[in-house]
Amino acid sequence: MVLPASMRLRGSRCFERLQKWGYRFYGTSMVLRVIEADPQLLKAPHRHHNSTACRCAVVISSKVSKRAVIRNRLRRRLHNHLRSRLEVAPEHCNHWVLISLKPVASAIEASPLLEECDRLLHQAGLLS
């Protein structure tokens, strides 16, 4: 299932800020970047949504898999997982999260991948 609009991270300025200044947490199959939310970087139509809520994005390059079907399956799996985890996150969770998958992610089963995602979210302090 796809992330709701209020939880989606959009805009090149947001991604640039996360890439440059975000705190990085490394796993074997993914890198999690976290930064405190800055609603001023959001485009005007998206600012009216809950600007201080957690917003997420998942980046999967063609190095992970040349097949779009596999990349989209991984993206949907992670979106669904992030949605279930961050919807129950504390109200003070006003961070932006970017998950970048490494090429080894396509060879890993679903449950270890999601467990690693949870571990990185705990390291980042987004889950208790």
UniProtKB/Swiss-Prot annotation:
Keyword field: Endonuclease, Hydrolase, Nuclease, RNA-binding, tRNA processing
Single GO BP term: tRNA 5'-leader removal
Similarity annotation: Belongs to the RnpA family.
Substrates-to-products reaction catalysed: Endonucleolytic cleavage of RNA, removing 5'-extranucleotides from tRNA precursor
Enzyme class: hydrolase
GO MF terms, alphabetically ordered: 3'-tRNA processing endoribonuclease activity; ribonuclease P activity; tRNA binding
Assembly behavior: Consists of a catalytic RNA component (M1 or rnpB) and a protein subunit.
Higher taxonomy: Bacteria, Bacillati, Cyanobacteriota, Cyanophyceae, Synechococcales
Keyword Lipid metabolism attributed: no
Primary role: RNaseP catalyzes the removal of the 5'-leader sequence from pre-tRNA to produce the mature 5'-terminus. It can also cleave other RNA substrates such as 4.5S RNA. The protein component plays an auxiliary but essential role in vivo by binding to the 5'-leader sequence and broadening the substrate specificity of the ribozyme.
Protein name (Swiss-Prot/TrEMBL): Ribonuclease P protein component
One GO CC term, this protein: ribonuclease P complex
Organism: Prochlorococcus marinus (strain MIT 9303)
Pfam families: Ribonuclease_P
Stored PANTHER family: RIBONUCLEASE P PROTEIN COMPONENT (PTHR33992:SF1)
